[in-house]
A protein has these predicted regions:
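Structural preference for solvent-exposed beta-strand-turn elements
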Residues: 1-152
């Protein structure tokens, strides 16, 4: 789970700015459901969400004891997860938004923020979505980046 969690954190953290006027946006929102873990990072202009499924290729990745949400400081969470000794990770949120992260013999305590304070994302209708292969998207960006303004 650590590797999947770290990948998700790396993706979501790309949207987080250390210079923000909204303090909760220095954190990553973790939403756990029976389907999996959704990680959300935002700077109020750009938001990145990534999803880790509970099961992949018939293999259990995440065990969900109880669904819930919390916002944890992104940089601190990333450093902790990156340095965890084993791939097994347990994240427990207790009363008062106290969060305990365990892996092997290591245990870390963080104070989280209420996920309800995190800005809501606008809902996007399914008919406005499309898929594009990543290599094609990279090519399109590479061939058009010269036209991007370097100043606002």
């Amino acid at each position: 789970m650590r590797d999947r969690l770290l990948d998700g954190l790396n993706n979501a953290m790309r949207a987080i700015s250390s210079k923000t006027t909204i303090p909760i946006l220095t954190g990553i929102k973790l939403d756990v459901t029976a389907e999996g873990l959704r990680l959300t990072g935002s700077d109020a202009d750009i938001t990145i969400q990534t999803f880790v499924k509970t099961e992949e290729n018939g293999k259990q990745i995440i065990n969900v004891d109880e669904p819930g949400s919390i916002v944890l400081q992104a940089r601190m969470l990333h450093e902790i997860v990156r340095k965890l000794p084993t791939n097994e990770v347990e994240i427990e949120v207790t009363t008062g938004l106290q969060t305990i992260i365990r892996s092997g013999k290591s245990e870390f305590h963080l104070i989280g923020s209420d996920a309800n304070e995190y800005p809501q994302l606008p809902e996007i209708a399914n008919n406005e979505q499309f898929s594009i292969p990543s290599d094609l998207l990279k090519t399109v960006i590479r061939e058009t980046v010269f036209a991007v303004s370097t100043s606002e």
